[in-house]
């Protein structure tokens, strides 16, 4: 076996049928072993990774030791053993009998027309052969005699007892398989003798055996594990009142019911274990890599700090003061919508900050920020005190087991009482150092900058006292995706935080279901960088798709390996989503529910500009409690503009499309209007949650309907010192009216909203309206960020009574 596998050493990734040939078995047997190992191949021609081949060979040897021995017995060829053994001279009657038997079907090797002499007499052995031709010549039978002097007839009969078993040919074929087959049949008959009959089919007893399945597994996967037909399991499910197909992903509860009925126990592998096994199959073992790091390889890395706190308590303003920048104006209503990561210098050291949203709705994003952080800075306003989000942020920091530094903000405002904040925090077991505890409290003013330097010093002191922050910068990079979005002109852009190793331009990375080669990296200031050491946040370009916030990223050696890991992760995630969204309706109450109209479902499609916002909105909607009569199903979510395929999916499933800071393209807009699909747009997440909750409960007030007046495409951009930026536009649909509300759209994403058409000109004349098919100059007030190809959409807000 080992020789066969090594013989293909020049092939980097052998095919499954080649491995089966080396092991002396068939591809179907190896495919079954691969499924038990958690590896899934499509066909015998699928290529296997070298680690998978080694594991497969080991598993095959353990499961089929008899086949391995059989392979070893058949290795030496028969002709090498038999050729030097010449038979002894036989009596004359036996030779004549062999000659007479030639016409009855024995092979005649003496009929080769290209041989120097018929019968190949030149190969005859000297000695006895010189007398035998004389005897045959008298009988006129020279050629057959020479033929059978070389290969005597009794030789095949003597070969069998010498070897003890049939040679690999026509003689003795099938002796061993027949015995194995009969044993298999006997074992199956014995097992099926007492097997229970459920739903008209017979299923072998499980006797409590544990079957490990991945999330989103199907009936076919379960059937292959226990070696039964999927149709039999479907019959059992039907008998239990469950309707399913062989390839449909089932949830854990359904598998537990099915397994209990037939005597098995099902264990659903957790996503972390599943992903760990997937990486190990590609020779990527993260735990082993960390264990291999010696003390000499480790270097001090900067601390990673997460700023947490209640909404509008000054988290982003504090970070802006530290960075000496202003990102607050870019957020809707002054509320942080997206996660940002930045690194600042404090003397000769660095500190990495992660700015998490302060909403309760963004619980998942904030919790994910706590998982990658070393120190949590809890911002509490001195005038407001402790709020619900403050307690929530404190719980996340404690669950992540990270030290806490409390920043008492807004001490410059009237009514500020920092001492009261310290007293309130003691009620939650956060004891200040002034009271004999171990938590540092720093009074600051993010607006004036007072106490910010002291806060940075407190962060470094806490890191030095409570933590040992070291990492190996000389290995391949590992880290976490902080945020990701689809950027116009750049494609998928992800903000990643390197946790160990060094990330370099050109590395092949895998993060979640996305993969690619790092084409470029920029820091928080937009400057290009060639490498990122541990605790360094950078924006990465070159990914195939938009990963999720919180996905871990790794660097692999080959593009093919990165693609295979991402594709397997995507398939596993798709199966898990199908299992989660599957509605389990029993046969007993299915008809009754349809007749009474109790089963009602609201299907939704969510599209957003960044993955973190989409995930947070989805999680918030899943927590809505609207009773048992109405259910909420999110059938699709994604990042980017609303496309025509989204509208088509909404048409088929009668779904509502929610756009968070994104707009539909022209085809999607026309299709939605033609099909009557409800498409709603939001820029603040709480507005979307409130509307959907009220619509589910039937408590919506008369809605404010947004009517589209016109759409213009920017063809040229002009700059005027008197008016400002003028967009030379072509009106594509409707009409553009002066003083109308407008928004600026770029690549399907709303860049600026709440605009007003302040000036409208056609040639040199001021006009009040320009209709479709004409060109005009449009001024949008103080908005200067206008580019060629942008869309200017004018709208009108009207009240619409609800039906």
From Swiss-Prot:
Q: Where is this region: G5?
A: 445-447
Which lineage is the organism of this entry classified under, starting from the top rank? Bacteria, Bacillati, Actinomycetota, Actinomycetes, Micrococcales
| Protein name as annotated | Translation initiation factor IF-2
- Which residue intervals make up region (G4)? 409-412
Where would you find this protein in the cell?
A: Cytoplasm
GO MF annotation list: GTP binding; GTPase activity; translation initiation factor activity
Q: Return the InterPro entries for the record.
A: EF-G-like_DII, EFTu-like_2, IF2_II, IF2_N, P-loop_NTPase, Small_GTP-bd, T_Tr_GTP-bd_dom, TF_IF2_bacterial-like
Q: What exactly does this protein do?
A: One of the essential components for the initiation of protein synthesis. Protects formylmethionyl-tRNA from spontaneous hydrolysis and promotes its binding to the 30S ribosomal subunits. Also involved in the hydrolysis of GTP during the formation of the 70S ribosomal complex.
Instruction: Outline the segment boundaries, as ranges, of region: Disordered.
Output: 65-186
**Stretches the record annotates as G1:** 309-316
Q: Look up the coiled coil feature and give its residue ranges.
A: none
Question: What organism, scientifically named, is this protein from?
Answer: Tropheryma whipplei (strain TW08/27)
């Amino acid at each position: 076996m080992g020789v066969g596998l090594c013989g293909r050493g020049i092939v980097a990734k052998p095919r499954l049928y080649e491995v089966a040939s080396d092991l002396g078995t068939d591809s179907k047997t190896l495919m079954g072993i691969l499924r038990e190992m958690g590896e899934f191949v499509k066909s015998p021609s699928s290529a296997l990774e070298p680690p998978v081949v080694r594991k497969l060979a080991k598993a095959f040897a353990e499961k089929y030791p008899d086949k391995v021995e059989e392979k070893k017995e058949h290795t030496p060829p028969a002709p090498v053993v038999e050729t030097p053994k010449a038979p002894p001279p036989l009596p004359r009657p036996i030779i004549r009998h062999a000659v007479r038997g030639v016409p009855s079907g024995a092979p005649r090797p003496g009929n080769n027309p290209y041989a120097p002499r018929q019968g190949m007499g030149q190969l005859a052995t000297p000695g006895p052969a010189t007398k035998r031709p004389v005897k045959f010549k008298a009988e006129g039978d020279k050629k057959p005699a020479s033929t059978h002097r070389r290969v005597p007839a009794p030789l095949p009969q003597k070969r069998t007892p010498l070897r003890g078993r049939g040679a690999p040919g026509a003689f003795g074929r099938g002796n061993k398989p027949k015995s194995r087959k009969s044993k298999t049949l006997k074992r199956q008959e014995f097992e099926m003798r007492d097997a229970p009959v459920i739903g008209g089919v017979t299923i072998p007893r499980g006797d409590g055996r544990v079957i490990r399945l991945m999330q989103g597994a199907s009936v076919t996967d379960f059937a292959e594990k226990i070696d039964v037909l999927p149709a039999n399991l479907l019959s059992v499910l039907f008998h239990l009142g469950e309707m399913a197909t062989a390839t449909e992903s089932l949830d854990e509860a359904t598998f537990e019911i099915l397994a209990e009925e037939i005597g098995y126990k099902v264990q659903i592998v957790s996503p972390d274990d599943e992903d760990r096994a997937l990486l190990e199959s590609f020779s990527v073992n993260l735990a082993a890599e960390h264990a291999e790091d010696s003390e000499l390889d480790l270097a001090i890395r900067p601390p990673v700090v997460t700023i947490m706190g209640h909404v509008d308590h000054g988290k982003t303003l504090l970070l802006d003061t530290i960075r000496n920048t202003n990102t607050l104006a870019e957020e809707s209503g002054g509320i942080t919508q997206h996660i940002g990561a930045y690194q600042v210098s404090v003397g000769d050291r660095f500190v990495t900050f992660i700015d998490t949203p302060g909403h309760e709705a963004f619980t998942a994003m904030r919790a994910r920020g706590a998982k990658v952080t070393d120190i949590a800075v809890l911002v509490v306003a001195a005038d407001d005190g402790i709020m619900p989000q403050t307690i929530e942020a404190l719980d996340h920091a404690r669950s992540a087991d990270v030290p806490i530094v409390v920043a008492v903000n807004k001490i410059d405002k009237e009514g500020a009482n920092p001492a009261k904040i310290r007293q309130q925090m003691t009620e939650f077991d956060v004891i200040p150092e002034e009271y004999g505890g171990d938590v540092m409290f720093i009074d600051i003013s993010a607006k004036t900058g007072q106490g910010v330097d002291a806060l940075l010093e407190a962060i470094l002191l806490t890191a030095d006292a409570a933590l040992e922050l070291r990492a190996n910068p000389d290995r391949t990079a590992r880290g976490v995706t902080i945020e990701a979005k689809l950027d116009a002109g750049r494609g998928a852009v992800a903000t990643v935080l390197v946790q160990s190793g060094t990330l370099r331009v050109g590395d092949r990375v895998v993060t979640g279901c996305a993969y690619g080669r790092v084409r470029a990296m920029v820091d928080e200031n937009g400057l290009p960088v060639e490498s990122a050491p541990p605790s360094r946040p950078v924006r990465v370009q070159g990914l195939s798709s938009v990963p999720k916030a919180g996905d871990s990223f790794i660097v692999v050696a080959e593009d093919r390996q990165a693609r295979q890991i991402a594709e397997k992760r995507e398939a596993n995630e798709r199966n898990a989503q199908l299992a989660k969204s599957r509605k389990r309706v029993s046969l007993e109450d299915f008809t009754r529910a349809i007749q009474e109209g109790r089963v009602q479902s609201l299907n939704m499609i969510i599209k957003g500009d960044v993955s973190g916002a989409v995930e947070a909105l989805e999680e918030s909607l899943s927590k809505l409690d609207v009773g048992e009569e109405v259910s909420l199903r999110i059938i699709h979510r994604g990042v980017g503009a609303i496309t025509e395929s989204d509208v088509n999916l909404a048409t088929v499933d009668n779904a509502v499309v929610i756009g968070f800071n994104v707009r539909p393209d022209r085809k999607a807009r026309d299709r939605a209007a033609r099909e009557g699909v409800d498409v709603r747009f939001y820029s603040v997440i709480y507005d979307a949650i409130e509307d959907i909750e009220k619509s589910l409960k039937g408590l919506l007030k008369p809605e404010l309907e947004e009517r589209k007046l016109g759409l213009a495409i920017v063809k040229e951009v002009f700059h005027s010192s008197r008016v400002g930026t003028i967009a030379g536009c072509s009106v594509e649909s409707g009409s553009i009216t002066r003083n109308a509300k407008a928004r600026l759209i770029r690549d399907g994403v709303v860049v600026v909203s709440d605009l007003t058409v302040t000036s409208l000109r056609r040639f040199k004349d001021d006009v009040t309206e320009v209709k479709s098919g004409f060109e005009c100059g449009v001024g949008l007030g103080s908005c200067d960020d206008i580019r060629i190809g942008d869309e200017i959409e004018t709208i009108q807000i009207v009240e619409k009574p609800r039906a």
